[in-house]
């Protein structure tokens, strides 16, 4: 939502750009990207390194990237609107739950809500969520200040987000009623 700040102000002749399609085209986990540079010698070294680290990306991924690139002119706007809808849905659903507070994220497609459930750390809470069929990351995996938080991705459909949030609410309600009554 914020304005783009270009790296080109530093001068293109000083730039080696590495990027992936993960965020731009929601191809997370695919590990497919590119390198751009006007420096022939640097690109020769990058090519050697890439050759020994990764033999190749599979054909299906390459065709998907090609398709995304061909439709790139309209895709980012459509995707941004879709992710705003998903973001609004997941943050609203989380903030409606007793003992849960969630700020609206401004960057990637993750939320990092705080859970007030006495007696449970974020790792234990993530396991409880997993047992209910919801995959998330414990906030403690992101440092000490993440304790009490969970990280959810909203890269799935709105319908799946709703189903997942129903399950999260079931876990939260059960744990809060059990832990607060003791």
What is each PLM-predicted segment?
Residues 1-182:
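PLP-dependent class I/II
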């Amino acid at each position: 939502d914020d304005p783009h700040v270009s790296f080109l102000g530093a001068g293109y002749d000083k730039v080696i750009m590495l990027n992936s399609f993960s965020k731009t085209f929601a191809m997370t986990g695919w590990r497919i990207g590119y390198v751009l540079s006007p420096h022939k010698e640097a690109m020769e070294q990058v090519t050697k390194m890439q050759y020994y680290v990764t033999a190749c990306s599979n054909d299906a991924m390459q065709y998907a990237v090609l398709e995304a690139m061909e439709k790139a002119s309209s895709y980012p706007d459509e995707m941004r609107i879709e992710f705003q809808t998903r973001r609004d849905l997941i943050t609203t659903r989380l903030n409606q739950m007793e003992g849960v507070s969630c700020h609206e994220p401004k960057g990637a497609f993750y939320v990092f809500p705080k859970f007030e459930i006495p007696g449970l750390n974020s790792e234990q809470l993530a396991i409880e969520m997993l047992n209910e069929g919801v995959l998330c990351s414990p906030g403690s995996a992101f440092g000490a200040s993440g304790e009490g938080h969970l990280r959810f991705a909203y890269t799935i459909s709105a319908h799946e987000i709703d189903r997942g949030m129903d399950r999260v609410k079931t876990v939260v309600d059960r744990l809060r009623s059990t832990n607060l009554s003791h």
